[in-house]
UniProtKB/Swiss-Prot annotation:
Family in the record: Belongs to the universal ribosomal protein uL18 family.
The protein's name: Large ribosomal subunit protein uL18
CDD domains xrefs: Ribosomal_L18_L5e
Subunit structure: Part of the 50S ribosomal subunit; part of the 5S rRNA/L5/L18/L25 subcomplex. Contacts the 5S and 23S rRNAs.
GO CC annotation terms, alphabetical: cytosolic large ribosomal subunit
Superkingdom field: Bacteria
Pfam family, one: Ribosomal_L18p
Annotated organism of origin: Prochlorococcus marinus (strain MIT 9301)
InterPro entries the UniProt entry points to: Ribosomal_uL18_bac-type (IPR004389), Ribosomal_uL18_bac/euk (IPR005484)
PANTHER family given in the database record: 39S RIBOSOMAL PROTEIN L18, MITOCHONDRIAL, LARGE RIBOSOMAL SUBUNIT PROTEIN UL18M
GO biological process, one term: translation
Chain's role: This is one of the proteins that bind and probably mediate the attachment of the 5S RNA into the large ribosomal subunit, where it forms part of the central protuberance.
Keyword Methyltransferase found: no
Length: 122
């Protein structure tokens, strides 16, 4: 039996999770994508198939503050706070957290904790 690569393991977990994580207008889905260099998060209404708001380490608002954010937990927490601020501004308090098949650890956990501290409930 061959061992799956980390990327395939992540994709397999994500497919398994997405069967149960469905966001709607009252409680949209907070989806997280983590690459080697950046982290992206967006609040999605699956029933209308629209992205309500998003934030990432390549976001224009964050690039104005510093030239390049490193790929660490501090950057992820900044993205989490920014996303929560934007979601609350649009009237969203509760979300369903979709970790994107990644383990709830490190950068993904830092983003989630920062979003909770900024006022999102999940």
């Amino acid at each position: 039996m061959t061992k799956l690569s980390r990327k395939l393991q992540t994709q397999k977990r994500h497919r398994r999770l997405r069967r149960f994580l469905i966001g709607d207008a009252t409680r949209p889905r907070l989806s997280v994508f983590r690459s080697n260099n950046h982290i992206y998060a967006q609040v999605i209404d699956d029933s209308a198939q629209t992205t309500i708001c998003s934030a990432s380490t390549v976001d224009k608002e964050l690039r104005e503050k510093s030239e390049k954010l490193p790929s660490d937990c501090n950057s992820s927490s900044i993205v989490g706070k920014l996303l929560a601020k934007r979601a609350i501004k649009k009237g969203i308090k509760q979300v369903i957290f979709d970790r994107g098949g990644n383990l709830y650890h490190g950068r993904v956990k830092a983003l989630a904790d920062a979003a909770r501290e900024a006022g999102l409930e999940f």
